[in-house]
Regions:
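Sequence-level detector for tyrosine residue identity
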Residues: 23, 101-102, 169
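Long, low-complexity intrinsically disordered regions enriched in small/polar
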Residues: 144-201
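Residue-identity detector for threonine
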Residues: 2, 11-12, 24-25, 54, ...
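Residue-identity detector for glycine
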Residues: 34, 38-40, 61-64, 110-112, ...
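Charged, amphipathic alpha-helical interaction modules
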Residues: 45-160
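N-terminal amphipathic alpha-helical segments
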Residues: 1-62
């Protein structure tokens, strides 16, 4: 199971690198809002955290039942793929039409989720994954970077003001639930519980 997790980590990092490459194409496009660029710029933080986790797991393994961390990584990987697909669609769009292409990509490829929400979601997934006792102490620096990035993205104006889906909140373990799509980070502990839902304001 550990090798399967390492393989999933490696695959997810490669997809992140592809997303980073796509974002680089549009990083200077001022027609796209700050949160779009904030999300693209912070993909590298996620990749670095996953690379660090891969290195620590190779040396120390993981504690406890491995089904939960594997499932969590699969959920994270789905968000990474959605982000890559959205950035790719925007990067391939004509320079004068990137914003409408982004709107279409969010609807078609992101299930209504804008890139900053997808990136915040994957960051939360990685923070929860890093709670595993075998790597928790060694991942403190990366987790701190991710939590700061989550808060920064949460305080940015949304990359799209319309055609948005509701906000999704998820907590898969005993760690903090960080839920702040368009506001400051709040933390709620649910011991061993799973909370997943859609909330509209």
């Amino acid at each position: 199971m550990t090798s399967a997790i390492e393989d999933l980590l490696s695959t997810t990092v490669e997809i992140l690198k592809a997303a980073i490459h796509c974002y680089t194409t549009v990083k200077d496009d001022n027609s796209l809002r700050g949160a779009f660029h904030g999300a693209g710029e912070r993909l590298r933080c996620v990749a670095q955290a996953l690379e660090a986790a891969t290195s620590h797991i190779a040396r120390h393994g993981l504690d406890g039942d491995l089904e939960e961390p594997r499932n969590l990584l699969q959920i994270c990987s789905t968000k990474v793929k959605q982000s890559r697909d959205i950035f790719q669609m925007v990067a391939r769009a004509p320079q004068t039409s990137r914003l409408p292409f982004y709107k279409a990509a969010v609807k078609q490829l992101g299930n209504g989720q804008v890139v900053e929400d997808l990136v915040k979601g994957m960051m939360i997934d990685v923070c929860v994954f890093a709670e595993n006792n075998a790597i928790k102490g060694m991942m403190r620096k990366e987790v701190a970077v991710l939590r700061n990035a989550i808060e920064t993205l949460s305080n940015m104006e949304p990359s799209l003001s319309t055609e948005r889906a509701g906000d999704s909140y998820n907590n898969w373990s005993t760690g903090d639930m960080l839920n702040a799509p368009r506001g400051k980070v709040t933390k709620n502990n649910f011991s061993g519980a799973t909370f997943s839902g859609t909330v509209s304001f």
